[in-house]
């Protein structure tokens, strides 16, 4: 039985965490509080430890095979989002960005365009460009929403006009790489917004690939007026779309990565074109860990989500007290907070370096997230009350 009376976020001290050797705890000196990378300060969930321990005890450390991953995701998705994905359309792959890369290789060719909606997860840029694809930006609005006019202009640029233009030579292949829920802003796209995206994509012949890794971290059921997560493949018009899911973000399994890609009915053949070799690097222990998380993790995840809601409220209150010039972007998902510091630092000052030097807090540099990121910082809320309080109080030195 899992004790949910104490949030997983409040079980480890700073001394406990500094025993870790992951990038979060080794990238900076010990006098810096690391609040930059999306890694949580929680002990590993007992059901994950048990699943991995059982596998190790019997030597179940061979190659992965089958649909174990998707079979565990299906009932989880039914419980959390009232959605029943089709496990038979799935492909288990080493992690989300490997899955995205393999899908881009199938759907596009070098020189084709990938549309992104910045500010957005930085690897969307790196992986896309490493494959020789062009990045076309369709920035979110100042409120962090998808903008149909901006998207349509990006689709037109990406496709050379697309099927909607009727121009000779138009209709180059293109993909929209959608982050849903959105990192770093915490935006949860509404069903209506997703329907609009799919309608525009259909008109311009743009394929939609969604990274839905942050889906378990929406909190509409815990707050007033929040937006619930809508799986892309549950929306009309998603027949040719592909969505990628992983438990690694919600259950802190970045060191045991795995993912599953799911296809709409018209994209099944495309997903099957992903080479078999792409799945050879799937970590069988990771699949077992993720399957255990999806199967046994509801109570643990709910306690964690409640802690994130509490921490978001705490950070908002403390920032207003200690750094009132910093504006907090409202969020409905993820465990990240997007901070607008444009009025808090003098012109010409690098906010990331300024905070690191004066406050000894490492935050995510907004410039890494593409258009609209300059003058912003990303704060990780997935830590204890004590550490979060100390970090925000330190930020008061910088702002």
Regions from the PLM with identified roles:
Residues 291, 308-316, 328-341:
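Conserved glycine-rich beta-strand-loop-beta hairpin in the small C-terminal domain of fold type I
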Residues 237-309, 399:
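Conserved core segment of the aminotransferase class I/II
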Residues 57-199, 216-235:
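Conserved core of the PLP fold type I
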Residues 131, 203-204, 239, 359:
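Helix C-cap/helix->beta junction micro-motif
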Residues 116, 137, 210, 363-365:
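Hydrophobic residues in well-ordered beta-strands that form the structural core
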Residues 354-363, 369-399:
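PLP-dependent enzyme catalytic core of the Aspartate aminotransferase-like
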């Amino acid at each position: 039985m899992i004790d949910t009376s104490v949030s997983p976020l409040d079980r480890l001290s700073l001394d406990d965490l500094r025993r870790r050797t992951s990038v979060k705890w080794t990238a900076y000196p010990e006098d810096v509080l690391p609040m930059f990378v999306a890694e949580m300060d929680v002990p590993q969930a007992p059901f994950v430890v048990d699943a991995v321990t059982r596998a190790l005890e019997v030597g179940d450390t061979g190659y992965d095979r089958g649909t174990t991953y998707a079979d565990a995701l299906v009932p989880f998705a039914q419980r959390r989002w009232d959605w029943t994905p089709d496990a038979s359309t799935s492909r288990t792959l080493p992690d989300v960005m490997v899955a995205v890369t393999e899908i881009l290789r199938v759907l596009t060719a070098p020189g084709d365009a990938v549309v992104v909606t910045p500010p957005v997860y930085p690897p969307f840029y790196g992986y896309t460009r490493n494959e020789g694809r062009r990045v076309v930006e369709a920035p979110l609005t100042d409120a962090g929403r998808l903008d149909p006019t901006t998207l349509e202009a990006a689709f037109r640029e990406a496709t050379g006009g697309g099927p909607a233009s009727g121009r000779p030579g138009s209709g180059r292949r293109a993909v929209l790489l959608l982050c849903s829920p959105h990192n770093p802003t915490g935006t949860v796209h509404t069903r209506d917004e997703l329907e609009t995206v799919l309608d525009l994509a259909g008109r311009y012949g743009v394929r939609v690939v969604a990274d839905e890794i942050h889906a378990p971290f929406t909190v509409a059921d815990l707050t007033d007026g929040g937006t619930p997560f809508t799986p892309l493949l549950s929306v009309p018009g998603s027949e040719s779309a592909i969505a990628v899911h992983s438990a690694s973000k919600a259950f802190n399994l970045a060191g045991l990565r795995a993912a599953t890609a799911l296809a709409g009915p018209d994209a099944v053949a495309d997903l099957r074109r992903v080479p078999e070799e792409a799945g050879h690097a799937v970590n069988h222990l990771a699949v077992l860990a993720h399957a255990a998380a999806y199967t046994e993790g509801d109570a643990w995840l709910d306690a964690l989500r409640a802690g994130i809601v509490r921490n978001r409220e705490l950070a908002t209150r403390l920032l207003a007290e200690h750094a009132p010039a910093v504006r907090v972007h409202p969020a409905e998902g993820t465990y990240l907070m997007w901070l607008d510091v444009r009025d808090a630092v003098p012109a010409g000052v690098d906010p990331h370096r300024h905070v690191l030097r004066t406050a000894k807090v490492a935050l995510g540099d907004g410039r890494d997230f593409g258009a609209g990121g300059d003058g912003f910082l990303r704060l990780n809320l997935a830590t204890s009350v004590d550490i979060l309080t100390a970090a925000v109080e330190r930020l008061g030195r910088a702002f």
